[in-house]
């Protein structure tokens, strides 16, 4: 297989949803249908002691939520699929955002009873901004929920995107019979003891079956005929531009509708796309020269070995283990001898990868999020990955002063992962951490204790707003007021931490010469 054929066989996507919509369950069932795992149903293991393949961190297993982005790779038909299971908890939207910079499409999971929820909307907007094609899986049809038309209208009105239902449900909850596939005009029954049924062109059942006397069946046929009469054909170009989402109904927990979705996904999802550089060069996935960028760093995937893995998206060319690459930020060459692929916490050595693949590089502290690696004589760098402005700030210190070495090592590694942001006061060198949500601090505290054996003391600093400074040379000591703290971030850039919006406006009006700005 040549490079072009290899690249065209790659499909790389992230799954986005509100917590508890069934995102991790769908991830696991996709792995099950691909043959990547032998046992389905290992999600939601709080009582059984089983844990989702993608939820590998101890805190995730204990709390039943995803707080890191897991990467899983598997083969299906003639395709190699890279799937990223993103954090479902809203406090980890920063990590999710960076993950969405590394994929070519997204799958949006919606709970049929709840419809569009806040986290779904937030993540959808990121996808829309990037023009990422979005597939929709409406989950939990075996429970009572909103009517199909109501759900489609909600998606279109709330998200401002056209919908195209690929299948249609017959009933829901206890009366859920199955789904009608629009293309094949077949009915896939929910219960295993039932056989597949067929409809003719007039939507009449070809077999004799008691379902014809069921009001849920009659309603589904009437609704489907209305959809068909609307006459809108599936528009693949609209999908690829992010203006239309194909919609699939099913139940991930019951393994129902998942394989239909997977079959359609590999047919319609885009192959790896081109990427823009800071130099305004478009790098094609078919370029012979290797390039890639780091979008995530994870410490202690194996706590026994205190390892650090940098997650890299291959953008162009072919990666070969042992090759020499240049880290553009430092302009230093390095030989990559340790590279890995993932099935959550299961890792195996990668000798070869092409555009679209996500691989892990063992990191001794060389990499930062957003780093570009290139082969050959290339000199470009990919655009920086966005950072969120924190909204909660805490002073942090080690409870035991004898643990300072472990404390600083833990801070350094966890900050480099990008899940929490680091600041230091100018004169006292007090460490202040910033986060977009409270859960990040809880996870930070948990990981410091369990991975670095350090108990930490955290104290709120009473500041809610961070603003960076365009013209640092004009900052003076008199600007450090009782309602603001002047600190440096991990890059030694000056940052004001303000008490509230009023304090921010007061500062801007009093010191007109200072230009403040925020991150995302």
Swiss-Prot record:
Q: Does the keyword Plastid apply?
A: no
Q: Where in or outside the cell?
A: Cytoplasm
- What are the alphabetically sorted keywords of the record? Cytoplasm, GTP-binding, Nucleotide-binding, Protein biosynthesis
Q: Which domain of life is it from?
A: Bacteria
**Which PROSITE patterns does the UniProt record give?**
G_TR_1, G_TR_2
Task: Give the GO terms filed under biological process for this record.
Answer: regulation of translational termination
> Per its record, what are the GO molecular function terms?
GTP binding; GTPase activity; translation release factor activity, codon nonspecific; translation release factor activity, codon specific
Q: Which CDD domains match?
A: RF3, RF3_III
Indicate which residues the UniProt annotation says bind GTP: 17-24, 85-89, 139-142
Q: Do you know which InterPro entries this protein is assigned to?
A: EF-G-like_DII, EFG_III/V, G_TR_CS, P-loop_NTPase, PrfC, RF3_C, RF3_dom_3_sf, RF3_GTP-bd
Q: Which residues form the tr-type G domain?
A: 8-277
Which terms in the GO cellular component ontology are assigned?
cytosol
Q: Which Pfam families match?
A: EF-G_D2 (PF22042), GTP_EFTU (PF00009), RF3_C (PF16658)
What is the stated purpose of this protein?
Increases the formation of ribosomal termination complexes and stimulates activities of RF-1 and RF-2. It binds guanine nucleotides and has strong preference for UGA stop codons. It may interact directly with the ribosome. The stimulation of RF-1 and RF-2 is significantly reduced by GTP and GDP, but not by GMP.
Identify its protein family: Belongs to the TRAFAC class translation factor GTPase superfamily. Classic translation factor GTPase family. PrfC subfamily.
HAMAP family with a match to the protein in the record: Rel_fac_3
Give the protein name, as stated in the record. Peptide chain release factor 3
* Organism (species): Staphylococcus aureus (strain JH9)
What is this protein's gene name? prfC
